[in-house]
Regions:
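Small/polar loops that bind or transfer phosphate-bearing groups
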Residues: 21, 228-229
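C-terminal catalytic lobe of FAD-dependent flavoproteins
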Residues: 66-72, 79-80, 91-225, 232-236, ...
C-alpha cells in the first residue's frame, strides 16, 4: 500500500491517505506532490450583520444577478433573527487577509439597497470578511469548479480544492463523496457506535434565570459575555468549538 510521508521538526509522519482540504493553501500542498500544477487565488468576501430589528425586512434570501465573480450581494434573514448582507468578491494576493475595508462595506450596503431599500448602515452590529478558495484555470474559457479527486499518479492523495460557493451547501455531500473515494482506496470498517448527531449548544439568551445560574455554576465561562448585542458568552463559544 502506498504511504505518504512528511518530516516535520525531525519527526516522520506516515499515512496511507492524505486529504488535501487546505482551502486557499490547497494549491501549495498539491504542487508539492503533483506534476500538473494548480493555482488558487483568495477571493475576499465582506459582510454586514444587521441588528435584529432589521430581521423582518425580508422573509427569504434575496439574490441579485450573478456574475463571473459569484452570486453577488444577497440579503438574508438569519436563524437568530438578524439580517445578513453580503458578500463582496475581490481577488487579493494575501492568503491571510481577512480584514474588512471601508470600500467593501460601503459596496455591501449600496448594492444590498438595490434589493431592500430600507437597509440602514447604522443598524450594522458587526462586520467580517472571509476568503473563498478560487481555483484559477490557465484557459479562461474553462469553467471553475470543485476539484475533488484522487491525484493522477499519486495513489492515496485526494484533492478537495477550490471549494467556493456553493461549498457550504455542498459540504455534507462532498464529505460523503470523499469518504467513498477513501473507501475505494483503503477499505475500512465503519464504526458501529458512530454518533451522527451533535449535542446542542446552550444559549444564555434563551435560557431561564435558573438555567443561566446552573450553567454558570457548572462553568464560570458562561458568565463572561463576549457579545452584548446577542448575549453570547465565552462558554457558548467554547462549547461550539469543542463540538466540531
Amino acid at each position: 500500500l502506498f504511504r505518504s510521508q512528511v518530516q516535520v521538526d525531525g519527526e516522520i509522519f506516515e499515512a496511507p491517505i492524505v486529504i488535501n482540504a487546505a482551502g486557499v493553501y490547497a494549491d501549495e500542498i498539491h504542487n508539492m506532490i503533483c506534476e500538473e500544477k494548480i493555482r488558487i487565488v483568495p477571493r475576499r468576501g465582506e459582510y454586514r450583520l444587521m441588528d435584529k430589528n432589521c430581521g423582518d425586512l425580508v422573509n427569504s434570501t434575496i439574490f441579485q444577478q450573478p456574475s463571473k465573480m459569484g452570486k453577488g450581494i444577497l440579503v438574508t434573514p438569519t436563524v437568530h433573527g438578524n439580517l445578513l448582507v453580503g458578500p463582496t468578491a475581490e481577488d487579493i494576493p494575501d492568503k491571510q487577509d481577512v480584514d474588512t475595508t471601508a470600500e467593501g462595506l460601503a459596496k455591501v450596503l449600496n448594492l444590498g439597497s438595490n434589493s431592500v431599500d430600507a437597509l440602514d448602515g447604522r443598524q450594522t452590529i458587526t462586520s467580517f470578511a472571509g476568503l473563498r478558495a478560487h481555483l484559477v484555470h490557465e484557459d479562461p474559457a474553462e469553467k471553475s469548479d470543485f476539484l475533488i479527486e484522487e491525484a493522477a499518479g499519486h495513489p492515496g492523495f485526494i484533492d478537495v480544492a477550490g471549494i467556493e460557493s456553493p461549498g457550504l451547501t455542498s459540504a455534507p455531500a462532498i464529505g460523503e463523496y470523499v469518504a467513498q473515494i477513501v473507501e475505494n482506496i483503503y477499505p475500512a470498517e465503519r464504526k458501529a457506535d458512530f454518533v451522527d448527531t451533535r449535542k446542542g449548544i446552550p444559549s444564555m439568551a434563551l435560557a431561564t434565570e435558573e438555567e443561566r445560574e446552573a450553567l454558570i455554576r457548572e462553568n464560570p465561562a458562561f458568565a463572561n459575555v463576549i457579545c452584548r448585542c446577542e448575549l453570547v458568552t465565552e462558554g457558548e463559544i467554547l462549547s461550539a468549538i469543542h463540538r466540531l
